[in-house]
Amino acid sequence: MDSPGQGEIARDSQGRPILDRYGRPVRVRPQPRQTPPTPRTPPVNETRVYQPRQTPPRQTPPRQTPPRQMPPRQTPPRQVPPQQQYQQPGQIGQVRPQPPVIAGDGGRRRKAISFKPRGCLGTIAGVLAVGLVLVFVVTLWADSKLNRVDATPATQVANTAGTNWLLVGSDSRQGLSDEDIERLGTGGDIGVGRTDTIMVLHMPRTGEPTLLSIPRDSYVNVPGWGMDKANAAFTVGGPELLTQTVEEATGLRIDHYAEIGMGGLANMVDAVGGVEMCPAEPMYDPLANLDIQAGCQEFDGAAALGYVRTRATALGDLDRVVRQREFFSALLSTATSPGTLLNPFRTFPMISNAVGTFTVGEGDHVWHLARLALAMRGGIVTETVPIASFADYDVGNVAIWDEAGAEALFSSMR
């Protein structure tokens, strides 16, 4: 008998049930009931007027449900057993400690970000190497540009303590153009140069250096020429005779020699951007092309050269040697300051101008000059040979030393 809802059993033409391959009767799927279609109302071609609802709005009271309080979740820290590491033979019982595991991270170990300084150190090493090579090349180039002269006399005094430099400022016009001569007020060519500045820098093994000024009109013995002004030795015998004259007059052995001319001094001042000086009184000297007021001010090359050359003051040459010491100390302080050395636009012009205008002894080099500059920058004691009187001789007006005071000063430097 057919079950309701499952369809009738299919039969063949003889009325026998049709079986599937498993021996089960095959049922005929019932046909779905056909629903008559709903008649469709044709659209009306008209516009309806919107009628708002006249129902008053529903008044809903606010919900007075208190906020739900959720207790904090108490999660115990996860206990992770220590990881056993492979042990080499002979290391039984030694367990390598493991880094702690942070609770809540699911036991996953985060890879720490490690800073590897190899690249940074390599860059720094490369920059330092390039800098050292550059310094080495510039040093050799500067040393090759120095003018050298034989300033060591054949006979020298006995060796004295420390190191002594003979520093000379000459009024040579060599290398100056007509425009430079007019700008600097140096006058025309005078032939063999004379020394406007004679100083001895004594650098002891310990303690501060001493910068000793020797007035150029000092009345001293010039070997082979007799008594004369100190600067006459340079005129008649050059650096070698001047060195010998200073050694015999002071008893100090001269180890190094350095000389700079007018043009070189002015160019160095301009290269470092000027030097600040503080004259105590106004100064006017048309022969030195100088016209400055009292007070602190910045000198360019022309003003600086006139400042160290002029003798238009009350004490003449004695005032000048004091100004020369002050100026050279200020110049070296400016030239060796970080603002100059770290500025390539000042350092290279300064070196270029300095090496071309400096004259040094045969055995002197640019590194000796660098040590000289650093010694003077660190603080120095300034002295002038004591003068007893002035007198007129056949060589002109000269300065007579105070023999006792001069000897005491020289002895302190030997």
From Swiss-Prot:
Residues 43-53 have a biased composition (Low complexity). Residues 1-120 are cytoplasmic. GO terms for biological process: cell wall organization. Residues 142-414 are periplasmic. GO terms for cellular component: plasma membrane. The chain crosses the membrane at residues 121-141. Induction: Transcriptionally regulated by IpsA. Residues 33-42, 54-80 have a biased composition (Pro residues). This is Probable cell wall biosynthesis protein LcpB. It comes from Corynebacterium glutamicum (strain ATCC 13032 / DSM 20300 / JCM 1318 / BCRC 11384 / CCUG 27702 / LMG 3730 / NBRC 12168 / NCIMB 10025 / NRRL B-2784 / 534).
